[in-house]
Amino acid sequence: MTFELKHRDRSHLSHHFNAILGNPPVEWKISDHLVEYPEALRYMQERVEKILAKTAHEQVWLLEHPSLYTAGTSADKKDLLAPHLFPVYEAGRGGEFTYHGPGQRIAYIMLDLKRRKQDIRAFISALEEWIIQMLASFNIKGERREDRVGVWVKQSHCPSKKNDLSSEDKIAAIGIRVRKWISFHGVSINVNPNLAHYSGIVPCGITNHGVTSFLNLGCPVTMHDIDIALKHAFEKIFGPTIDVS
C-alpha cells in the first residue's frame, strides 16, 4: 500500500518507534557513489521480500542519486514542467513529483512495522521528528505542517530572506510505501543540491512554498556531518543500528 497523508493532526502522536525486545539492530548502509534510481528501486524491493522472509534484517540506506525526477502515486502530469530536463521515473511511493540529485542525502527506510508499531500516520510523524532532531543539531529549526508532509524551515533562518518572516520552504521530503507492513522509500534532505533543478517540476504539487537547503540557509556542512547527525537522531527514535557495507 502507498500512503497519502491528508489534513489530519499528527503532532500528538508518539515519536518513539523502538522495535520489540530482541530485535536485531537496524543495518546502517552508506553508499559513497551516485546510485542509479532503477538500481535503488530494485534493491529496496528485493530487501523488502527478504525482510518478509526473515532472511534479512531491517536497514537504512544512505545514498545520493544522479539528477532525476520521480513521480509518486498522486503525481499530476501538469506538475512536470520540463519533462526532458532529467530522466523521470515512476516511484510507486506516496506523494507527487520530486527531484533527486547530487548534494541531496537520500535515506531509504526498510523497517518492519509489525515489530514496532502498525500505525502509518505515527510512522510518518516519527520520520519527521527524526529530521527535526537532526536539523536541531545544526541549530536549524525544522517544523512539521499538518496540511503537508515533510519538514519545513521558516525563511527568517535564511540570510537572503531574513526580512520575509512569512515565507517557509521545504528542506526535507518524505515519501514512503508499505508492503505487508514493511516500509521502503523514505526521506530526502537538501544538503547542497542545485536548487534550480527543482524548476522542472512543481515539487510535491505545492505552488505557494519553495525548497531550501543547508547551504541556502548559510550552513555549509559535509555529507559526513549529516550522516553522523542522522544516525544519532535515528537511534533515539528507532533504536540501535549497526554499520554494514
UniProtKB/Swiss-Prot annotation:
The record marks 170 as: Lowers pKa of active site Cys. Residues 54-242 form the BPL/LPL catalytic domain. GO terms for cellular component: cytoplasm. It is an enzyme of class 2 (transferase). This is Octanoyltransferase. HAMAP family: LipB (MF_00013). Keywords: Acyltransferase, Cytoplasm, Transferase. Belongs to the LipB family. PROSITE patterns: BPL_LPL_CATALYTIC, LIPB. The active site is at residue 204. Pathway: Protein modification; protein lipoylation via endogenous pathway; protein N(6)-(lipoyl)lysine from octanoyl-[acyl-carrier-protein]: step 1/2. GO terms for molecular function: lipoyl(octanoyl) transferase activity. One of its GO terms (biological process) is protein modification process. Disulfide bonds: none annotated. It is found in: Cytoplasm. Substrate binds at residues 93-100, 173-175, 186-188. It comes from the Bacteria. Transmembrane segments: none annotated. The keyword Transferase applies. Catalyzes the transfer of endogenously produced octanoic acid from octanoyl-acyl-carrier-protein onto the lipoyl domains of lipoate-dependent enzymes. Lipoyl-ACP can also act as a substrate although octanoyl-ACP is likely to be the physiological substrate. Pfam families: LplA-B_cat.
